[in-house]
């Protein structure tokens, strides 16, 4: 007979003392929830034994459970051939006061076969202990063994509680002390629990023992597989009490709740910007460090976010899975489709308190506010130029690097931005999707339409501090300022000639290349400048560029305009 619970020594405890074993028939009697509970309890018990330093080697049962196999398959060295069936009423004679379920009794009898049961000759038709006197010795041995087992079972619940209390108490204390005794040899990272280290090691080994039967995707943690399965079932057990939105992960709900509180606990030490998610702060920090860990294998381009790389890859594939139900236009990103839909609805939720201008996206409002504040947080390390948007800085950097990833299939012209290529293609197609409601004039750029509308309003919000001259475009003001500074930052590598505008340099380069992308549909003549093509078209239409008020003569040649003006004014 074992001693009282207090006399149990932790050093002699084994995993089999806290494990239950099932046959195939018994295992099939359990429903899915019970099977999952069994797996979780057995794995937790083993982790607890490992934690207190009792389990020397991993049992086959644990390996089996970790791999998602059925536990009744496991070969156990303690198991021997099944003895003749012990009927339930005979077991009740042995344990008259217990009343355990039949299958559990069989588990107990099977687990403790070592007590001489291999020689047990139980008559099939025994109905009571009195009829089995001939087997008294064998019975006594079995009875003693099962009495010992009975005491173990009666103590099991209390023992497990004490054991869990012991192990959880120690784990809880470690949480407060911050002690991390378990170190990864691969990367030096430390953990306070051995089970956490074991999970971490799978990152280095690439081991993913938990596989989804539905789609075959594998994970290195059982909890990740459980969460993944909700994608197939559509289960979202975590619901926001504030707005009713549901999530399939508790962490997603926790993150979502911060939206309602407005709290932003994660602050950037570099610039002071705050975020409601630690992941967003991590991504933001890459702006300052310039780190881009996600690289495209197709073109070598690197990104600071994995989601941006995923979206970029679609460019190479040409895939556009997100289609607008309103107009049929397709997009490579769902976020772009969401933004596009606002064109049809006309919704603009985000309003500037400074000037009243409204925007369909919060990010656009944030960027717009920098016009009023003059803030330019994104600075180029190469030349010191600062920008209001990180994307503008990224594009600017390509000037120094000379990178042009996006090539036109029609004329082979290359661009540093995909949006520039899209705009350029409209030269070949003649597409002008942006139309003025006031006069009907159409443009191939939304920015051109915005600028054009100012003609009707007469608004000139961009004023030069040097001379007071006002402009309807910020870009025009920037170009104008160069007049005062005399700066010519755009230099031709071919001949050394410098220009104060990048567009002038682009046009100039065509002299060296001989390129003439602007072709007249009427006569086929080609030009290297769109403005020259527009003037040329007037030859066919008969339109005159300039007509003085003092005479009836008109000029269709821009070179003669100055001479006409002087002649009309009576100058020599």
Curated annotation (Swiss-Prot):
Main location as per UniProt: nucleus
Pfam families to which the protein is assigned, alphabetical: KRAB, zf-C2H2
SUPFAM superfamilies reported in the protein's UniProt record: beta-beta-alpha zinc fingers, KRAB domain (Kruppel-associated box)
ZnF bounds (C2H2-type): 182-204, 210-232, 238-260, 266-288, 294-316, 322-344, 350-372, 378-400, 406-428, 434-456, 462-484, 490-512, 518-540
Compartments where located: Nucleus
Entry annotated with the keyword Nucleus: yes
KRAB domain: residues covered: 13-84
GO biological process: regulation of DNA-templated transcription
CDD domains per UniProt: KRAB_A-box (cd07765)
Record-linked InterPro entries: KRAB, KRAB_dom_sf, Znf_C2H2_sf, Znf_C2H2_type
Stretch forming the signal peptide: none
Domain of life: Eukaryota
Record's keyword terms, sorted: DNA-binding, Metal-binding, Nucleus, Repeat, Transcription, Transcription regulation, Zinc, Zinc-finger
GO molecular function list: DNA-binding transcription factor activity, RNA polymerase II-specific; RNA polymerase II cis-regulatory region sequence-specific DNA binding; zinc ion binding
Any GO CC annotation of this UniProt entry: nucleus
Disulfide bonds: none
Entry function: May be involved in transcriptional regulation.
Family indicated by similarity: Belongs to the krueppel C2H2-type zinc-finger protein family.
Name the UniProt record assigns to this protein: Zinc finger protein 98
Classification of source organism: Eukaryota, Metazoa, Chordata, Craniata, Vertebrata
